[in-house]
């Protein structure tokens, strides 16, 4: 099951994103700073009192070109659709506005827990003014200053109190995967073709896939899979005007729940910025990845077409050198039979554990090939390395000074580890840590 979801809503400039970042804190880890990996966030995971939850920053979905009230309406609709708990942020400096009242009326209809956070209460004298917000009819207003972190704990306490019951543990032997990509790249047709039967509605018009339904199936070897459909383009019979930004959020939720992500690209249209943005989210989330070029049957090809495509994909997705590329057709089912086996292999890579002794042999061999760098006369010393996690495989390298571990040398060590062990389709994380 997915983690419970918290939506942070409110009119522009009340501090939604600041509160979002404050709650997310350092749990949003940017492992690499590579061009093409997106840095913006509308979705993250938070934790408080041993309860984990997903968060949506609706401020990240604002359409700045849309009319003011349309932005707010869009946020409220997303919160109603997606959230288990809603945090409604208002400004203590400005008091209640017409836009606040509009959002409140929308939230009454959700029948979901709403936490009223009065932001920008930066000094004790302002606390007396927050009681005016009782007039919104959403219960006790909680004074906070998200910039300074004041009152954030009270909001988190309220979130945890209102979370649904603990979700059941999932079967770790079931491989979860999702197909992500721009609307109308053929995800629904691929799903149908993979399953061999019609389970969802397939249509050439974006906005015709109904509610997401997890689909379970077993291959001929008895391996169980759960396919998580991003769906959500059309809910309650209504197509959201800002479909692409809404689909980003849906894709990110699917990525969060997946072990392996199939990034679907439309061969007729080529690679778009949206593709790189979504792939960047999956990469940063540490998910296994396959790049799937669909509608391959529609292209006129010569002996160089596939090679040219592969080179272009590697150039456009420089942060995904580990991701295999497959050219398929949902219509003719070309190469689709290979996907379940590829997903299994990548899942195995994600769960690989390397004994410390073997890992350190590889590290020492790497140093012999390419000695550690120096900075201002001081040389980096590597004492030992150990694997600390899987999904994705994560290694801590203990050194004399973290600052001496240049990014380029860390990348060199990653490449040497990849040569020694099979990590196809999965990112691996290397972390330099000073030995104490």
Curated annotation (Swiss-Prot):
UniProt entry tagged with the keyword GTP-binding: yes
Description of the deletion phenotype: Essential for growth, it cannot be disrupted.
Protein name, UniProt field: GTPase Der
SUPFAM superfamilies found in the cross-reference section: P-loop containing nucleoside triphosphate hydrolases
Molecular function in Gene Ontology: GTP binding; ribosome binding
Domain annotation KH-like: ranges: 352-436
Alphabetized PANTHER family for the sequence: GTPASE DER
GO biological process, one term: ribosome biogenesis
Name of a matching Pfam family: KH_dom-like
Family: Belongs to the TRAFAC class TrmE-Era-EngA-EngB-Septin-like GTPase superfamily. EngA (Der) GTPase family.
Subunit structure: Associates with the 50S ribosomal subunit.
Function as written in the Swiss-Prot or TrEMBL entry: GTPase that plays an essential role in the late steps of ribosome biogenesis.
EngA-type G domain sequence ranges: 4-167, 175-351
Alphabetical UniProt keywords: GTP-binding, Nucleotide-binding, Repeat, Ribosome biogenesis
Positions annotated to bind GTP 2: 181-188, 229-233, 294-297
Residues noted as binding GTP 1 in the record, renumbered to the chain: 10-17, 57-61, 119-122
UniProt gene name: der
InterPro entries hit by this protein: G_ENGA, GTP-bd, GTPase_Der, KH_dom-like, KH_dom-like_a/b, P-loop_NTPase, Small_GTP-bd
């Amino acid at each position: 099951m997915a983690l419970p979801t918290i939506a942070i809503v409110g009119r522009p400039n009340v501090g939604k994103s600041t509160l979002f970042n404050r709650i997310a804190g350092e749990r949003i880890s940017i492992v690499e700073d590579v061009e093409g990996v997106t840095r913006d966030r509308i979705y993250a995971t938070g934790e408080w009192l041993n309860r984990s939850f997903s968060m949506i920053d609706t401020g990240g979905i604002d359409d700045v070109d849309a009319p003011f009230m349309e932005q707010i309406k869009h946020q409220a609709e997303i919160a109603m659709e997606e959230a288990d708990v809603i945090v409604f942020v208002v400004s203590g400096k400005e008091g209640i506005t017409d836009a606040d009242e509009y959002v409140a009326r929308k939230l009454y209809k959700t029948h979901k827990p709403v936490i009223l956070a009065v932001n920008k209460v930066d000094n004790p004298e302002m606390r007396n003014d927050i009681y005016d917000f009782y007039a919104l009819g959403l219960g006790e207003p909680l004074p906070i200053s998200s910039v300074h972190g004041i009152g954030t704990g009270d909001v988190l306490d309220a979130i945890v109190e209102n979370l649904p019951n603990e979700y059941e543990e999932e079967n770790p032997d079931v491989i979860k995967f999702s197909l992500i990509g721009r609307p109308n790249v053929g995800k629904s047709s691929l799903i149908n073709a993979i399953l061999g039967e019609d389970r969802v509605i397939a249509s050439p018009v974006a906005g015709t896939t109904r509610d997401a339904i997890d689909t379970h199936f077993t291959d001929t070897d008895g391996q169980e899979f759960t396919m998580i459909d991003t769906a959500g383009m059309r809910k309650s019979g209504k197509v959201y005007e800002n479909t692409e930004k809404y689909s980003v959020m849906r894709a990110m939720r699917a990525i969060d729940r997946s072990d392996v992500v199939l990034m679907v690209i439309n061969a007729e249209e080529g690679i778009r910025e949206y593709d790189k943005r979504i792939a960047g989210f999956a990469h940063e989330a540490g998910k296994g990845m396959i790049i799937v070029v669909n509608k391959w049957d529609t292209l006129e090809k010569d002996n160089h077409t596939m090679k040219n495509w592969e080179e272009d994909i590697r150039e456009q997705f420089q942060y995904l050198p580990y991701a295999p590329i497959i050219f398929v057709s949902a219509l003719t089912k070309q190469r689709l039979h290979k996907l379940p086996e590829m997903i299994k292999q990548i899942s195995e890579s994600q769960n690989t554990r390397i004994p410390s002794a073997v890992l350190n042999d590889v590290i020492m061999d790497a140093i012999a090939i390419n000695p550690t760098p120096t900075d201002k006369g001081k040389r980096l010393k590597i004492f030992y390395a150990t694997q600390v996690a899987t999904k994705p495989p994560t290694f801590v390298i203990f050194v004399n000074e973290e600052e001496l571990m240049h990014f380029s040398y860390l990348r060199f060590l990653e490449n040497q580890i990849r040569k020694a062990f099979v990590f196809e389709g999965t990112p691996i994380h290397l972390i330099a840590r000073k030995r104490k």
